[in-house]
C-alpha cells in the first residue's frame, strides 16, 4: 500500500509539473512576432502569493529590449505552451486538467521597456466558463484554458480602438482551478508583453491595482470545480467596454485557427544599441542589435528568437534543446 501510494503521489506530482505553462509568443494582426517582446518568466510555475508584485508580470527571466507595434482596434493573439520555445501542438498548451479562465489586461506606461507594472490595469478580454449540458461536474464544462488547448495555445484579443496611443504592458493570465477548493489553491500563470499602440483615441478606462485585482476568498478564485456548477464569476474587474469576450467552448477563429509557425514570416524588431559582452557557446554569435539577457534569463533554445547575449558576468548554458539560460 505504501509503495502504491508513493507511486501514485509521484505520478500526480509529475503530471502537475508537466501541466505548468507560460504565455510565450505574440501575433499582431496575424503577423508572428514570436517571443521578441515577451517578458518570459524564469519558469513555467504559477505565482502562489496573490499579494506579491510578481502577480503583475511573473518572476521575469528575460526582459526584452524591443516593443511590438500594435494598432488600436487591431487584434493580438497570445500564445501559451508548456515548455519554453516549444510551439508544437502535440501536447496541450496547459494540460493536467488545469481548467480555468483566461483574461488579458493592459496598463498605460511611459516606457514599456522599463515599466514595472505599478500603474493601473484595465481588463480587455475574458474567456471564462460555460455549462456543458452533457457534463456532470465543473471539470466537464467549457473553460477558457480548454479553448487554449483546442487552439494550439492561441487566444485572440481585440485591442480597444479608443485607448490612447503610446506604450503599454499587455498582461495575459490563465488561472488553473484544479486545486482551488481551498484558500490559496488557485494557480495563476501570467506573462507581460511590451507593446506600442498607434492610432488610438482619448479614452480613460477605469483601472485596478495588481496585486489586488482579486483575493484568495473571491468566489471565482476559491471554487470547487470537481462538483456540479451552476455559475462562475471570473476573477478581477469587468472587461472594459472597448474590449471583448469569448464564449467558452466556441470554435477557434481567425489567427487561432489559421496562424501556425511558418504561416507568416516572423517580423524581426530592432532593439536599442547597447554595450554588451557576447556569451560563448550559444551558437548565435551574439545578439542582434546588442541587446542583453540578465542572469538566469533565457538566451537560446530551439525556436527561441530573443536576445542571445548574456550580461557581463554570466554565460549562456544549454539546459536542454528548448531552453538555454544565462548563469
UniProtKB/Swiss-Prot annotation:
Binding site for O2: 178, 187
Cofactor, how bound (note): Binds 1 copper ion per subunit.
A Pfam family that the UniProt record links to this protein: CBM_1
Enzymatic reactions: [(1->4)-beta-D-glucosyl]n+m + reduced acceptor + O2 = 4-dehydro-beta-D-glucosyl-[(1->4)-beta-D-glucosyl]n-1 + [(1->4)-beta-D-glucosyl]m + acceptor + H2O
Glycosylated residues, chain numbering: 317
GO cellular component terms listed in the entry, alphabetical order: extracellular region
GO molecular function, one term: monooxygenase activity
Subcellular location: Secreted
Residues of the signal peptide: 1-19
Comment, domains: Has a modular structure: an endo-beta-1,4-glucanase catalytic module at the N-terminus, a linker rich in serines and threonines, and a C-terminal carbohydrate-binding module (CBM). The CBM domain is essential for binding to and subsequent oxidative degradation of polysaccharide substrate.
UniProt function note: Lytic polysaccharide monooxygenase (LPMO) that depolymerizes crystalline and amorphous polysaccharides via the oxidation of scissile alpha- or beta-(1-4)-glycosidic bonds, yielding C1 or C4 oxidation products. Catalysis by LPMOs requires the reduction of the active-site copper from Cu(II) to Cu(I) by a reducing agent and H(2)O(2) or O(2) as a cosubstrate.
Name of this protein: AA9 family lytic polysaccharide monooxygenase B
Naturally occurring in which organism (per UniProt): Podospora anserina (strain S / ATCC MYA-4624 / DSM 980 / FGSC 10383) (Pleurage anserina)
Amino acid at each position: 500500500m505504501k509503495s502504491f501510494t508513493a507511486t501514485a503521489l509521484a505520478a500526480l506530482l509529475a503530471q502537475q509539473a508537466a501541466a505548468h505553462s507560460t504565455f510565450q509568443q505574440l501575433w499582431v494582426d496575424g503577423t508572428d512576432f514570436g517571443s521578441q517582446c515577451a517578458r518570459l518568466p524564469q519558469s513555467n510555475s504559477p505565482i502562489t502569493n496573490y499579494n506579491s508584485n510578481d502577480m503583475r508580470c511573473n518572476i521575469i527571466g528575460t526582459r526584452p529590449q524591443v516593443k511590438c507595434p500594435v494598432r488600436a482596434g487591431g487584434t493580438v493573439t497570445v500564445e501559451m505552451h508548456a515548455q519554453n520555445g516549444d510551439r508544437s501542438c502535440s501536447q496541450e498548451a496547459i494540460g493536467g486538467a488545469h481548467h480555468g479562465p483566461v483574461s488579458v489586461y493592459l496598463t498605460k506606461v511611459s516606457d514599456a521597456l522599463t515599466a514595472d507594472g505599478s500603474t493601473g490595469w484595465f481588463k480587455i478580454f475574458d474567456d471564462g466558463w460555460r455549462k456543458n449540458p452533457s457534463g456532470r461536474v465543473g471539470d466537464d464544462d467549457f473553460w477558457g484554458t480548454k479553448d487554449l488547448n483546442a487552439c494550439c495555445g492561441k487566444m485572440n484579443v481585440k485591442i480597444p480602438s479608443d485607448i490612447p496611443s503610446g506604450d503599454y504592458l499587455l498582461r495575459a493570465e490563465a488561472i488553473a482551478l484544479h486545486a482551488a477548493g481551498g484558500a490559496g489553491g488557485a494557480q495563476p500563470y501570467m506573462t507581460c508583453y511590451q507593446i506600442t499602440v498607434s492610432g488610438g483615441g482619448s479614452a480613460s478606462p477605469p483601472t485596478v491595482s495588481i496585486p489586488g485585482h482579486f483575493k484568495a476568498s473571491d468566489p471565482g478564485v476559491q471554487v470547487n470545480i470537481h462538483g456540479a456548477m451552476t455559475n462562475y464569476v471570473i476573477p478581477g474587474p469587468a472587461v472594459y467596454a472597448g474590449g471583448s469576450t469569448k464564449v467558452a467552448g466556441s470554435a477557434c477563429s481567425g489567427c487561432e485557427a489559421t496562424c501556425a509557425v511558418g504561416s507568416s514570416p516572423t517580423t524581426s524588431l530592432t532593439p536599442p544599441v547597447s554595450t554588451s559582452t557576447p556569451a560563448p557557446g550559444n551558437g548565435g554569435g551574439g545578439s542582434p542589435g546588442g541587446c542583453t539577457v540578465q542572469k538566469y534569463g533565457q538566451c537560446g533554445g530551439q525556436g527561441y528568437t530573443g536576445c542571445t547575449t548574456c550580461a557581463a558576468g554570466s554565460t549562456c548554458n544549454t539546459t536542454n534543446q528548448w531552453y538555454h539560460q544565462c548563469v
